[in-house]
């Protein structure tokens, strides 16, 4: 059986990042309509998510809160944070080998780090969602994060998508009406555009990163 790993929420200035793993047969994933989460509507993602839970041999995920993201971004180590939790997920879900959607501009470098950390057969790819298990993991990560964001919005009100490019998100940050623990203070948006300070990076990137 093959494992796939992907994340959701790497780039937002508000809320957690979620990394997920799915282990299963490729044919099973294709039959239930798995594809890259970005190509599915929220309703379709929810429906496929429930099917993934039924057919997969293993599904697991980790939620990484803004404070921990900030701690790594402040040292230019966002990829290292992803690698740490990806390795943990690999060790929790047995498979013959694992495909990972690489956050690093050099997938081989990221792959080597995971092989060293886990001792498992790992293949890191750009555009890993072409692998059904990675696409399934992207759906799981996205659904879990979306549910957490909806719960947060029930508590604090609408703040848009949470991404730095969203005017509604920027407005809420300017107004200072977001709980501090929900904000990624190291993002450049927080200090550069909003003037709240503690800023470092536009979207947590370092020179080895490939995604926002």
From Swiss-Prot:
<keyword id="KW-0378">Hydrolase</keyword>
<feature type="binding site">
    <location>
        <position position="7"/>
    </location>
    <ligand>
        <name>a divalent metal cation</name>
    </ligand>
</feature>
<dbReference type="InterPro" id="IPR004649">
    <property type="entry name" value="RNase_H2_suA"/>
</dbReference>
<keyword id="KW-0464">Manganese</keyword>
<feature type="domain" description="RNase H type-2">
    <location>
        <begin position="1"/>
        <end position="199"/>
    </location>
</feature>
<keyword id="KW-0479">Metal-binding</keyword>
<dbReference type="GO" id="GO:0005737">
    <property type="term" value="C:cytoplasm"/>
</dbReference>
<comment type="similarity">
    <text>Belongs to the RNase HII family.</text>
</comment>
<dbReference type="InterPro" id="IPR020787">
    <property type="entry name" value="RNase_HII_arc"/>
</dbReference>
<keyword id="KW-0963">Cytoplasm</keyword>
<dbReference type="Pfam" id="PF01351">
    <property type="entry name" value="RNase_HII"/>
</dbReference>
<dbReference type="GO" id="GO:0043137">
    <property type="term" value="P:DNA replication, removal of RNA primer"/>
</dbReference>
<dbReference type="GO" id="GO:0003723">
    <property type="term" value="F:RNA binding"/>
</dbReference>
<dbReference type="InterPro" id="IPR012337">
    <property type="entry name" value="RNaseH-like_sf"/>
</dbReference>
<keyword id="KW-0255">Endonuclease</keyword>
<dbReference type="GO" id="GO:0006298">
    <property type="term" value="P:mismatch repair"/>
</dbReference>
<protein>
    <recommendedName>
        <fullName>Ribonuclease HII</fullName>
        <ecNumber>3.1.26.4</ecNumber>
    </recommendedName>
</protein>
<feature type="binding site">
    <location>
        <position position="6"/>
    </location>
    <ligand>
        <name>a divalent metal cation</name>
    </ligand>
</feature>
<dbReference type="InterPro" id="IPR001352">
    <property type="entry name" value="RNase_HII/HIII"/>
</dbReference>
<dbReference type="GO" id="GO:0032299">
    <property type="term" value="C:ribonuclease H2 complex"/>
</dbReference>
<dbReference type="GO" id="GO:0030145">
    <property type="term" value="F:manganese ion binding"/>
</dbReference>
<dbReference type="GO" id="GO:0004523">
    <property type="term" value="F:RNA-DNA hybrid ribonuclease activity"/>
</dbReference>
<comment type="function">
    <text>Endonuclease that specifically degrades the RNA of RNA-DNA hybrids.</text>
</comment>
<dbReference type="InterPro" id="IPR036397">
    <property type="entry name" value="RNaseH_sf"/>
</dbReference>
<feature type="binding site">
    <location>
        <position position="101"/>
    </location>
    <ligand>
        <name>a divalent metal cation</name>
    </ligand>
</feature>
<dbReference type="InterPro" id="IPR024567">
    <property type="entry name" value="RNase_HII/HIII_dom"/>
</dbReference>
<keyword id="KW-0540">Nuclease</keyword>
